Amino acid sequence: MELMNIARVRWACRRGMLELDVLFQPFVDNVYQDLSDEDKVLFIRLLECEDPELFAWFMGHEVCPDPELARMVVQVRGRAAP
């Protein structure tokens, strides 16, 4: 996925779970453009994970085993809402 193609990133944020949509959509709308290219790549990697994993990480039921992705989870949770 292209880092600068915001439409594709927004589309990838559309998940099968409303709880994830509520986190990802505001993050993309309000924060994604200001991320470094490295963090954009990391966010896209996060979007490639399965919904049940993402749900568990974002709801705090499990800790993401990948430290880089875990950092992005914290960043999204902390900055998704305006």
Curated annotation (Swiss-Prot):
Belongs to the SdhE FAD assembly factor family. InterPro entries: SDH (IPR005631), SDH_sf (IPR036714), SdhE_FAD_assembly_factor (IPR050531). Coiled coil: none annotated. SUPFAM superfamilies: YgfY-like (SSF109910). Keywords: Chaperone, Cytoplasm. Pfam families: Sdh5. Signal peptide: none annotated. One of its GO terms (cellular component) is cytoplasm. An FAD assembly protein, which accelerates covalent attachment of the cofactor into other proteins. Plays an essential role in the assembly of succinate dehydrogenase (SDH, respiratory complex II), an enzyme complex that is a component of both the tricarboxylic acid cycle and the electron transport chain, and which couples the oxidation of succinate to fumarate with the reduction of ubiquinone (coenzyme Q) to ubiquinol. Required for flavinylation (covalent attachment of FAD) of the flavoprotein subunit SdhA of SDH and other flavinylated proteins as well. It comes from Shewanella oneidensis (strain ATCC 700550 / JCM 31522 / CIP 106686 / LMG 19005 / NCIMB 14063 / MR-1). It is found in: Cytoplasm. This is FAD assembly factor SdhE. Its main location: cytoplasm. One of its GO terms (biological process) is succinate metabolic process.
